[in-house]
Amino acid sequence: MPKNLRFSVFLLFLLCINSVFGEFGPEDAQYNETEARMLLSLSAAAYSLDVTPCIGRTFSPAENQTLLSTFSVRCDFVGNPCAGYIVVSDVLQQITVVFRGTKTSSQLLLEGWTTLKPSSDFYGMGLVNTYFRSGHEKTWQYVQDALSISQYRNYDVYVTGHSLGGALAGLCAPRIVHDGLRQSQKIKVVTFGEPRVGNIEFSRAYDQLVPYSFRVVHSGDVVPHLPGCVKDLSYTPPAGSDGSMPCDPVSTNGGYHHAIEIWYPGNMTQGDPFMVCTGLPRDEDFGCSDSLKVNLGDTNQGVWDHRNYFGVEVPDFGKGGCDPSMTFKGPPTKTGVLSLVGSVFGRKRRSIR
């Protein structure tokens, strides 16, 4: 039986099972900013050699969050690591898997070279980026071991990460369901600045397997625009626009996002508005961040937006133990790619604040 057909049969069986147990479907998923802020702190902690200060500041003692394991493996031929850690709470009956983001400029460069087109089959779910697939395979055993511990078998699972960490989270979560370690309704995923991980076939399979999943995007963060999607050539940009075009929801050749985007067009300070991006194309809502045309020759603002979420510089915040008294430099002057943010936000019909 072909792999794609085997996966389709497996997926149909899985959906039948989940319907009996009351699957947590997309229509039930509600973005929780308080929860997202906590997961951002945990994602920041992954950049530190010692994650315990962030864990202690993120959760109350009553939740009894305990560090279960840490991992760091060589990701590529220059020795860049794929790393993360796993936290467990017996009180909440919850396991949280956290992946670290890009740590060095050389690693960012390698990601750029190898994310041009999804080309590696991911267990019959569709094609994904080879570099991300390699990182997933090298870290998977640590996740599998943790979720297979008998006393934790019924615990809910959260998966999170920033940047590269978000990409690894995006592969880890559907693999958990695919391998039968958890049912769909037991998993929640929130990522920050996640790049496109696979093609549209992977996107559709992911959405079925992990319905509670959000990609948080800060304004003009450049990374979620990479690798580029195939543009819908049937779309005619309006007169006077910058010529930006939506992703083609049919093409299987390029990158295509999965999960619901949560877009913050501003600086993500306390009280800033955000959008739940459920418009078309599905998972690539052209009324949200994908409406911005990114100039890869001038990415200062886009890189700043990528490193700064919820008012903190993510890697430095984690290295500083997630100390809320830390101060960070403000954003550069918003020009070019972000000049459209105000008008886009103003005409967007779906605002949840």
UniProtKB/Swiss-Prot annotation:
<keyword id="KW-0732">Signal</keyword>
<dbReference type="GO" id="GO:0016042">
    <property type="term" value="P:lipid catabolic process"/>
</dbReference>
<dbReference type="Pfam" id="PF01764">
    <property type="entry name" value="Lipase_3"/>
</dbReference>
<dbReference type="GO" id="GO:0005576">
    <property type="term" value="C:extracellular region"/>
</dbReference>
<keyword id="KW-0442">Lipid degradation</keyword>
<keyword id="KW-0964">Secreted</keyword>
<keyword id="KW-0378">Hydrolase</keyword>
<keyword id="KW-0443">Lipid metabolism</keyword>
<feature type="active site" description="Nucleophile">
    <location>
        <position position="163"/>
    </location>
</feature>
<dbReference type="InterPro" id="IPR029058">
    <property type="entry name" value="AB_hydrolase_fold"/>
</dbReference>
<protein>
    <recommendedName>
        <fullName>Lipase ZK262.3</fullName>
        <ecNumber>3.1.1.-</ecNumber>
    </recommendedName>
</protein>
<feature type="active site" description="Charge relay system">
    <location>
        <position position="221"/>
    </location>
</feature>
<feature type="glycosylation site" description="N-linked (GlcNAc...) asparagine">
    <location>
        <position position="64"/>
    </location>
</feature>
<feature type="signal peptide">
    <location>
        <begin position="1"/>
        <end position="22"/>
    </location>
</feature>
<feature type="glycosylation site" description="N-linked (GlcNAc...) asparagine">
    <location>
        <position position="267"/>
    </location>
</feature>
<keyword id="KW-1015">Disulfide bond</keyword>
<comment type="function">
    <text>Probable lipase.</text>
</comment>
<feature type="active site" description="Charge relay system">
    <location>
        <position position="306"/>
    </location>
</feature>
<comment type="similarity">
    <text>Belongs to the AB hydrolase superfamily. Lipase family.</text>
</comment>
<dbReference type="InterPro" id="IPR002921">
    <property type="entry name" value="Fungal_lipase-type"/>
</dbReference>
<feature type="glycosylation site" description="N-linked (GlcNAc...) asparagine">
    <location>
        <position position="32"/>
    </location>
</feature>
<feature type="disulfide bond">
    <location>
        <begin position="277"/>
        <end position="288"/>
    </location>
</feature>
<dbReference type="GO" id="GO:0016787">
    <property type="term" value="F:hydrolase activity"/>
</dbReference>
<keyword id="KW-0325">Glycoprotein</keyword>
